[in-house]
């Protein structure tokens, strides 16, 4: 989620309710103090997917205090709030994800996470290394402002606080797919949904990619079974670690040597390797897990087949037994931004961050289960830059990497000053949408 090629500043006419804009301009400083305080608190107390108990309770209490109707315990810890405006209009959904990552924070911030937990059998730190704390705080701020200004709202606003975007614990369902399966769209019937994601592009920049915006994602797992033996006599066993090394080397040739990615980008990465308990024991078992990112279902099928062929070849050559699983923990479809919706609504992003709106022409190989929502109804998912002010602005190409760590890094940093644009973007989208699409 770090690489962008963005272009074409457009000039579009737009209107926002005069009262709503004046009230937002008047209230924004006090509101942002609250948003920042909420973010720092959530950042300091991160929770993994389907375990966002403290976070969801904080959200529930806040929404209820605003007089917003609340439904809780959706897909384990999800929260939905419904605000009815005083004017007739459509039901519009805004979404924020709540979960953190098994990452030990190294930012040195005064509100840095010190939380630890057990994940996949390992003691790990927990960190909001993907900025979901910012997403929650922004949407809490939007809910507060809109609730206080519901006399200017045309229609209903559905606030979706979603658990487990990063994936649920193994053996559990979760995330957007589970919220839909539990009927949130059937009950509340939104006709459009908007979401945002913070990332390390220049401060306050808002960027959107029409059409396929983010990749489909599948996790794979490869289990390797050998014959355990003493490390001093490897010939008396079958070494799964040697087979694992061959697998990793071969997996990295799929994209670089076996696939034409000129028109269809793809990624195959290895992210987890487990084997062994002692230095002098060749173990019986080893395991590899990784991720596959594609934009084309036929290409994804080809990659699955390539991985299976590689596994068969390595098993034959090493004497190990190898099994392959795909879609471990679920599958995320391509995140698709309805082009007509983007064209109709990008003016809202332009006025939320004047002079810093960019329309991208290159999709991102990150993945998002917001894609499940936008498969059901038209959706628009956009990016908010959270670098420190000035970082990256010296570059003519806003897509270049900066010296700010990217999402999922233990050094990932959200500059609080950028959250203002996120609040404004959501407010303007809600105000502008009725009658525009």
Regions found by a protein language model. Give the residues of each.
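Sec-dependent signal peptide recognition
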Residues: 1-8
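Divalent metal-coordination and catalytic microenvironments
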Residues: 42, 81, 94, 132, ...
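Histidine/acidic-residue-rich, glycine-tolerant segments that coordinate divalent metal ions
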Residues: 116-127, 133-134, 145-146, 151-272, ...
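Short, flexible, mixed-charge acidic loops at enzyme active sites
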Residues: 105-116, 211-215, 393-405
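Metal-dependent amide/peptide-bond hydrolase catalytic core
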Residues: 65, 245-437
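Acidic/His- and Gly-rich active-site-bordering loop/insert found
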Residues: 20-127, 137-155
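N-terminal signal peptide c-region/cleavage motif recognized by signal peptidases
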Residues: 13-15
């Amino acid at each position: 989620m770090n690489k962008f090629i963005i272009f074409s500043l457009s000039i579009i006419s737009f209107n926002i309710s005069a009262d709503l804009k004046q009230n937002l301009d008047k209230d924004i400083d006090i509101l942002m103090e609250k948003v920042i305080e909420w973010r720092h608190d959530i950042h300091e107390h991160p929770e993994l997917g389907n375990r966002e108990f403290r976070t969801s309770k904080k959200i529930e209490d806040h929404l209820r205090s605003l007089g917003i109707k609340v439904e809780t315990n959706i897909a384990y810890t999800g929260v939905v709030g419904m605000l009815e405006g005083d004017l007739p209009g459509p039901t519009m959904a805004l979404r924020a994800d709540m979960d953190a990552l098994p990452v030990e924070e190294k930012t040195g911030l005064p509100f840095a996470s010190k939380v630890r937990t057990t994940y996949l059998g390992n003691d790990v730190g927990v960190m909001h290394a993907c900025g979901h704390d910012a997403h929650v705080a922004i949407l809490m701020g939007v809910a507060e402002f809109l609730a206080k200004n519901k006399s200017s709202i045309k229609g209903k606003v559905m606030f979706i606080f979603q658990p487990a975007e990063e994936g649920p614990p193994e053996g559990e369902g979760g995330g957007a797919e589970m919220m839909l399966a539990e009927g949130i769209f059937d009950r509340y019937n939104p006709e459009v949904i908007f979401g945002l994601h913070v990332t390390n592009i220049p401060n306050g920049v808002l960027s959107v990619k029409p059409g396929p915006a983010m990749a489909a994602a599948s996790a794979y797992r490869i289990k390797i079974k050998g014959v355990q033996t003493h490390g001093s006599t490897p010939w008396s066993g079958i070494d799964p670690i040697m087979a694992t090394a061959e697998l990793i080397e071969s997996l990295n040739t799929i994209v670089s040597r076996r696939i034409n990615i000129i028109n269809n980008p793809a990624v195959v990465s290895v992210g987890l390797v487990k084997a062994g308990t002692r230095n002098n024991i060749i173990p019986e078992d080893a395991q590899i897990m990784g991720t596959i990112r594609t934009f084309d279902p036929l290409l994804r099928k080809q990659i699955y087949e390539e991985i299976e062929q590689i596994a068969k070849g390595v098993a034959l050559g090493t004497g190990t037994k190898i099994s392959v699983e795909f879609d471990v923990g679920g599958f995320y479809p391509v995140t698709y931004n309805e082009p007509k919706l983007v064209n109709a609504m990008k003016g809202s992003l332009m006025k939320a961050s004047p002079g810093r709106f960019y329309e991208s022409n290159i999709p991102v190989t990150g993945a998002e289960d917001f894609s499940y929502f936008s498969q059901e109804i038209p959706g628009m998912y956009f990016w908010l830059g959270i670098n420190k002010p000035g970082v990256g602005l010296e570059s003519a190409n806003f897509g270049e990497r900066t010296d700010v760590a990217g999402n999922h890094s233990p050094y990932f940093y959200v500059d609080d000053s950028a959250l203002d644009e996120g609040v404004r973007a959501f407010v303007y989208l809600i105000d502008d949408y009725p009658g525009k699409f």
